[in-house]
């Protein structure tokens, strides 16, 4: 588990504030303080608190380590008398296809933003597998070209931003520019 944790932390450019040995020692102490026995342990390491909400990694931020225990049932001996069953359904994996839902799950956006920052940019424009513009890491996108304002159509890949809607309403009310919501291609 700790090896997988460190692999995941490395994948998001986050360094654990503790060695594996120190984490293991802390987790064992937590289990002891909670009476031992059949306990599960939940461990989470975050980048840490910051006073400014931003998509780029905050500087000078200390990672937060959070852990708790919870009771788990006795392990089954494998016999049919103690084995338990459950039902399951199958669904397409849509975990990364829900950009239109406002949530705190910003990992994809944050990782894209860090790539932009590392390349000296302030934002990143994101394209789907059809080379159509979706949005930027931290905002919706508008392109002004030849007296028209282009913005991608809303779909499951785009968060319907409040500012996006207000910009469209203001442009319609106060300008004679054409507003086109349509696919915007990379070329």
Q: Model-derived features: where do they sit?
A:
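Conserved catalytic-core subdomain
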Residues: 133, 138-187
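Conserved alpha/beta cores of soluble small-molecule-handling proteins
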Residues: 1-125, 129-132, 169-187
């Amino acid at each position: 588990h700790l090896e997988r944790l460190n692999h995941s932390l490395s994948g998001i450019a986050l360094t654990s504030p503790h060695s594996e040995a120190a984490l293991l020692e802390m987790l064992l102490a937590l289990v002891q303080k909670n009476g031992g026995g059949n306990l599960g342990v939940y461990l989470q390491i975050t980048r840490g608190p910051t006073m400014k909400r931003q998509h780029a990694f905050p500087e000078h931020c200390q990672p937060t380590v959070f852990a708790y225990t919870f009771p788990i049932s006795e392990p089954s001996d494998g016999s049919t008398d103690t084995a338990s069953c459950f039902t399951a359904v199958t669904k397409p994996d849509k975990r990364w296809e829900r950009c239109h839902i406002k949530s705190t799950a910003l990992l994809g956006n944050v990782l894209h933003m860090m790539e932009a920052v590392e390349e000296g940019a302030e934002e990143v424009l994101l394209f789907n597998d059809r080379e159509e513009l979706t949005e930027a890491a931290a905002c919706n996108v508008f392109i002004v070209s030849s007296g028209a304002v282009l913005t991608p159509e809303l779909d499951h890949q785009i968060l319907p931003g409040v500012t996006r809607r207000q910009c469209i309403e203001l442009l319609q009310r106060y300008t004679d520019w054409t507003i086109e919501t349509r696919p915007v291609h990379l070329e």
